[in-house]
């Protein structure tokens, strides 16, 4: 019987990888009307949380709010599957407030799979993609194609391990830790993308054959222990404190299930001694592995080596679900051999008799340095090829989801022949992250941080809808129902702000003495509620207590009005800085400027600016390693020099 090639399926967009980036990318493209296929190695592990089963935290929660404001799904799934919610940094300013939810990892995965299966235009395929089909392959293969806009080739589809070819005009790679994945326990290793799942073959070589540079990164996850074997009654309990708060701006999706507590223990002298005696058995300290791991999520051995002066480290015991006894030992990832891990766990108070269900392990994997991407997350070498998530060198479900949405959006717009969307740094943490990724030569897993943004007071979680939902509606990501909800909320917010600016409280009013005591300042005659809120220590909750704010008013409206009023001066100044930086983009820089002596610039920026010698701010902003914070510092320095020069010339006269 003569051989016949299998029929080729055609899609508009193909997404490779079913993690948090891949799911957001596929859902976004499908909702924009594109026929979309999502390929994954295991349909039973869709949107899996292989490390910490949690969503949110500092800067990460802002990302989740932003993804939701643009129509993404990570926020509402985190809300629906939350086991516990807490507000972090609550004692600090609103720029760094962060919602964090402990989630039921299996329920989260099931709900995401159901959502994908119910989405029109979206097909799911379980297969290993090992190759890329292109026209104009720089290596000399493929069909002839005339290069355009700097691209050396154009994507036409993907090829699977068993030889099937699927055609598409755009392909989004979201392969996580699976490209060349190798997991390590002590000095033992095996090919795997994560424990129990095979690594992906072929794609790294396919990318390299197209001229892409690849490298290796590392991450790790701690052991899981049986809850029933832990003496929880001996440990500090950490209950939920934010069951009434949500990531999603859509109140019709809010679900508050029964909350579960986490618990806290600490390392001991025995913990530290056992680690110090066996450091050479770990992949990093033993020299078996040299890939860079995440700076902000170090292993327990890294903590003990780097912070040798600390005699104890806090460890959190977090549930993985309502229907499983598995406990995630946060802050205790390790590269020690499995035979030592149980002994190590049993040095922790409350875990003296614990049962280890899964050992800790490290995983190193191939990634694509993101300087090879444009801000749309399309690769510079191959038109129609996009990448997102850990493949771009990031760490975290939230970072992955945000990139997935951007890549899916721009893949869809490419197919439609529409202009690519770039998210400016000053408009969102999404923009901040992507700007960092594509402009900086990063050699360790990237995590979003509030300190990475120069505009964090403006880029808060509570106002993510105000910043991004109008754009989402314009792009077709937000439907009419969500748009109506948004408009109603904004009307209520503006009405409340106006009321607070107009309504006054007199010194003779019954509530005045208590409010004066709260602030330590007298009310002279009368004062508007807005000016009262501007006083330190006064919050909308205090006004509710005295009948000055409607307790039935939505929390988002109450807090939004309070923040806008209380921080109005700071917000105006930060917006002025943003506007000034935009205006200054064409400002010329002196040819003889000595960047080495500008101490407010980062060391990297001083070196890069000296080497390049940009003519203006626009050129300076394109130099990898020169951040927007550096540009702001340079602008301030130039203004100070200008004032000093003017002052000196005036004095001379």
From Swiss-Prot:
Residue ranges crossing the lipid bilayer per the database entry: none
This protein's GO CC annotations: cytoplasm
Residues engaged in binding NAD(+): 293-307
Lyase among keywords: no
GO BP, sorted A to Z: tRNA methylation; tRNA wobble uridine modification
Domain of life the protein comes from: Bacteria
UniProt-annotated location(s): Cytoplasm
PROSITE patterns in the cross-refs: GIDA_1, GIDA_2
SUPFAM superfamilies named in the record: FAD/NAD(P)-binding domain
Pfam families: GIDA (PF01134), GIDA_C_1st (PF21680), SAM_GIDA_C (PF13932)
Residues reported to bind FAD: 17-22
One annotated GO molecular function: flavin adenine dinucleotide binding
Keyword Cytoplasm in record: yes
Cofactor(s) listed: FAD
Keywords of the record: Cytoplasm, FAD, Flavoprotein, NAD, tRNA processing
Subunit organization: Homodimer. Heterotetramer of two MnmE and two MnmG subunits.
Stated role: NAD-binding protein involved in the addition of a carboxymethylaminomethyl (cmnm) group at the wobble position (U34) of certain tRNAs, forming tRNA-cmnm(5)s(2)U34.
Family as reported in the entry's similarity comment: Belongs to the MnmG family.
Name of the featured protein: tRNA uridine 5-carboxymethylaminomethyl modification enzyme MnmG
Species of provenance: Prochlorococcus marinus (strain MIT 9303)
């Amino acid at each position: 019987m003569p051989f016949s090639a299998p029929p080729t399926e055609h899609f508009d967009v193909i997404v490779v990888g079913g993690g948090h980036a891949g799911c957001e990318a596929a859902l976004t493209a499908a909702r924009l009307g594109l026929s979309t296929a999502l390929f994954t190695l295991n349909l039973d592990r869709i949107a899996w949380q292989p490390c910490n089963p949690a969503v949110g935290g500092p800067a990460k929660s802002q990302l989740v709010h932003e993804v939701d404001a643009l129509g993404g799904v990570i926020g509402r799934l985190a809300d629906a599957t939350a086991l516990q919610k807490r507000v972090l940094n609550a004692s600090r300013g609103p720029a760094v407030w962060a919602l964090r939810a402990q989630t039921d990892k299996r329920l989260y995965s099931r709900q995401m799979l159901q959502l994908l299966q119910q989405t029109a235009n979206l097909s799911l395929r379980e297969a290993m993609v090992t190759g890329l089909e292109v026209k104009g392959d720089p290596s000399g293969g493929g069909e002839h194609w005339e290069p355009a806009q700097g691209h050396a080739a154009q994507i036409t589809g993907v090829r699977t391990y068993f030889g099937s070819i699927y055609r598409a005009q755009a392909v989004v790679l979201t392969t996580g830790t699976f490209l060349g994945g190798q997991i390590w326990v002590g000095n033992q290793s095996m090919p795997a993308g994560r424990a129990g799942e095979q690594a992906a073959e072929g794609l790294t070589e396919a990318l390299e054959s197209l001229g892409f540079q690849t490298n290796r990164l590392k991450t790790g996850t701690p052991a899981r222990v049986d809850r029933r074997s832990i003496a929880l009654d001996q440990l500090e309990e950490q209950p939920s404190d934010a069951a009434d708060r949500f990531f999603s701006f859509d109140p019709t999706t809010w679900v508050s299930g029964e909350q579960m507590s986490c618990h806290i223990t600490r390392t001991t002298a025995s913990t530290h001694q056992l680690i110090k005696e066996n450091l050479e058995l770990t992949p990093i300290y033993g020299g078996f592995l040299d890939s860079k791991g995440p700076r902000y999520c170090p292993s327990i051995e890294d903590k003990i080596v780097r912070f040798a002066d600390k005699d104890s480290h806090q460890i959190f015991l977090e549930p993985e679900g309502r229907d499983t006894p598995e406990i995630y030992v946060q802050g205790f990832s390790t590269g020690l051999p499995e035979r030592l891990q149980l002994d190590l766990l049993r040095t922790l108070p409350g875990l003296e008799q614990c049962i280890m269900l899964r050992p800790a392990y490290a995983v190193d994997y191939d990634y694509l340095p993101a300087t090879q991407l444009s801000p749309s997350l399309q690769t510079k070498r191959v038109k129609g090829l996009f990448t997102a998530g850990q493949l771009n060198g990031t760490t975290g479900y939230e970072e992955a989801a945000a990139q997935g949405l951007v890549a899916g959006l721009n893949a869809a717009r490419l197919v439609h022949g529409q202009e690519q969307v770039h998210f400016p740094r000053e408009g969102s943490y999404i923009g901040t992250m992507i700007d960092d990724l594509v402009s900086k030569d990063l050699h360790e897993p990237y995590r979003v941080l509030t300190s990475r943004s120069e505009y964090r007071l403006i880029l808060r979680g509570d106002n993510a809808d105000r910043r991004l939902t109008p754009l989402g509606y314009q792009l077709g990501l937000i439907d009419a129902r969500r748009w109506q909800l948004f408009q109603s909320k904004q009307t209520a917010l503006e009405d409340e702000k106006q009321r607070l600016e107009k309504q006054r409280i007199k010194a003779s009013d019954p509530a005045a003495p208590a409010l004066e005591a709260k602030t330590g300042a007298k009310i002279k005659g009368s004062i508007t509620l807005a000016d009262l809120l501007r006083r330190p220590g006064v919050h909308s909750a205090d006004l509710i207590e005295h009948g000055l704010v409607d307790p039935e008013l939505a929390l988002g409206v109450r807090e939004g009005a309070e923040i806008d009023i209380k921080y109005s001066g700071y917000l105006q100044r930060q917006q002025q800085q943003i506007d000034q930086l935009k205006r200054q983009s064409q400002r010329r820089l002196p040819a003889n400027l000595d960047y080495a002596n500008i101490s407010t610039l980062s060391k990297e920026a001083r070196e890069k600016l000296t080497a390049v010698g940009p003519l203006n701010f626009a050129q300076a902003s394109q130099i990898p390693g020169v951040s927007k914070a550096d540009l702001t510092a340079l602008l301030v320095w130039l203004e100070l020099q200008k004032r000093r020069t003017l002052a000196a010339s005036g004095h001379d006269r």
